[in-house]
Amino acid sequence: MSTTFQLDTSTSRANPTPAPMKRLTIPAIRQRKKDGVTAQPVVMLTAYTARQAQLLDAHCDLLLVGDSLGQVIYGLPSSVPVTLDMMAAHGAAVVRGSYHAAVVVDMPFGSYEASPQQAFESASRLLKETGCAAVKLEGGEAMAETVAFLTNRGIPVMGHVGLTPQAVNVLGGYNARGRSEAEAAKIVGDARSLADAGAFAIVIEGVVEPIAIAITQAVACPTIGIGASAQCDGQVLVTEDMLGMFERVPRFVKIYEDLAGTISGAAARYADEVRARTFPGIEQTYQPK
C-alpha cells in the first residue's frame, strides 16, 4: 500500500490543521482551574492513530490514548486484555501526529495495581517510548499512594473515578454509579484522595450529576466529565462514539456525525464501480505520453 502519514499543516477539508501552535503543558491545564473556577472548559477526545491525532489536535486541549482502543481498534470485549505494548505503540503514534494538545496515555489493567514501584516502571516506560505528557490510571483512595509516588518522581497523573471500565468485572456492568448515599460518599472521597495525592486532573465517568458537581466543587484540580455533568471543568468522549461509528453507544454520547454511514456508502460506491469496470477511469490511470 502506498499511503504514508505526513504531518500536513495546510488548511483544507481533508487537512483542517492550522499553522503549528505551541503544545499545551500539564501545568497549563491544571492552571485552568483557579480558586475553584475554570474559565474555559477543558476539551479532550480519544485518539489512537497519528492521522486521527492530526485531525483532532487543533480542536483539543488534551488527547487521550485510551485503553478503550481494545474495543474500538481491536474488537476486544473490554479494556481488560489491553497490554502495555499496545498502549506504547498507539501513544507514540498519537504524539507524532499532534503538536498542540497535551497527550495522556492510559495505563492498562495489570500495569500499575501491584505496587507504586510497578506503576513507576510502567509509567516511565510510557513516557520514554511515546513522548506523552502524562499517564492516566483508574481507582480512588486505594491508588492515592501510587499517584503521589509517581508525581513525586516527575510523572504527571490523571485520575479516574466513578465508573471505572477496568473494574467492570467487579462492578458487574457499565451502570451509572453514585445512586446510593454510601456509594456517592465513596466516589467523592476517592476524588478528594487523588487530588490531595497530586493528580493534575480527574476523569469522572458515569455518575449521577449531583456527585459530579460535588466533586468539581470539592477538588482543586480540573474535573473532566464523561456521562457526568456539564458543570465539570471539561469533557471527554470516545471519538468513534461521537462520530457515529458504532450502532450502540452509551446514553451520555452525543453523535455529531454519521461517519459509519459515510464510510459504508463510499465502500458501496467503490465496489459498484469496480464491478462495473468504471474504476479506475482515465483520471486514475497512467497513459503513454
From Swiss-Prot:
<dbReference type="GO" id="GO:0000287">
    <property type="term" value="F:magnesium ion binding"/>
</dbReference>
<keyword id="KW-0566">Pantothenate biosynthesis</keyword>
<dbReference type="Pfam" id="PF02548">
    <property type="entry name" value="Pantoate_transf"/>
</dbReference>
<feature type="binding site">
    <location>
        <position position="67"/>
    </location>
    <ligand>
        <name>Mg(2+)</name>
    </ligand>
</feature>
<keyword id="KW-0479">Metal-binding</keyword>
<keyword id="KW-0808">Transferase</keyword>
<dbReference type="InterPro" id="IPR040442">
    <property type="entry name" value="Pyrv_kinase-like_dom_sf"/>
</dbReference>
<dbReference type="InterPro" id="IPR015813">
    <property type="entry name" value="Pyrv/PenolPyrv_kinase-like_dom"/>
</dbReference>
<protein>
    <recommendedName>
        <fullName>3-methyl-2-oxobutanoate hydroxymethyltransferase</fullName>
        <ecNumber>2.1.2.11</ecNumber>
    </recommendedName>
</protein>
<feature type="compositionally biased region" description="Polar residues">
    <location>
        <begin position="1"/>
        <end position="15"/>
    </location>
</feature>
<comment type="subunit">
    <text>Homodecamer; pentamer of dimers.</text>
</comment>
<dbReference type="GO" id="GO:0015940">
    <property type="term" value="P:pantothenate biosynthetic process"/>
</dbReference>
<feature type="binding site">
    <location>
        <position position="106"/>
    </location>
    <ligand>
        <name>Mg(2+)</name>
    </ligand>
</feature>
<feature type="region of interest" description="Disordered">
    <location>
        <begin position="1"/>
        <end position="20"/>
    </location>
</feature>
<dbReference type="GO" id="GO:0003864">
    <property type="term" value="F:3-methyl-2-oxobutanoate hydroxymethyltransferase activity"/>
</dbReference>
<feature type="binding site">
    <location>
        <position position="136"/>
    </location>
    <ligand>
        <name>3-methyl-2-oxobutanoate</name>
    </ligand>
</feature>
<dbReference type="GO" id="GO:0005737">
    <property type="term" value="C:cytoplasm"/>
</dbReference>
<keyword id="KW-0963">Cytoplasm</keyword>
<comment type="pathway">
    <text>Cofactor biosynthesis; (R)-pantothenate biosynthesis; (R)-pantoate from 3-methyl-2-oxobutanoate: step 1/2.</text>
</comment>
<comment type="function">
    <text>Catalyzes the reversible reaction in which hydroxymethyl group from 5,10-methylenetetrahydrofolate is transferred onto alpha-ketoisovalerate to form ketopantoate.</text>
</comment>
<keyword id="KW-0460">Magnesium</keyword>
<feature type="binding site">
    <location>
        <position position="106"/>
    </location>
    <ligand>
        <name>3-methyl-2-oxobutanoate</name>
    </ligand>
</feature>
<feature type="binding site">
    <location>
        <position position="138"/>
    </location>
    <ligand>
        <name>Mg(2+)</name>
    </ligand>
</feature>
<dbReference type="InterPro" id="IPR003700">
    <property type="entry name" value="Pantoate_hydroxy_MeTrfase"/>
</dbReference>
<comment type="similarity">
    <text>Belongs to the PanB family.</text>
</comment>
<feature type="binding site">
    <location>
        <begin position="67"/>
        <end position="68"/>
    </location>
    <ligand>
        <name>3-methyl-2-oxobutanoate</name>
    </ligand>
</feature>
<feature type="active site" description="Proton acceptor">
    <location>
        <position position="205"/>
    </location>
</feature>
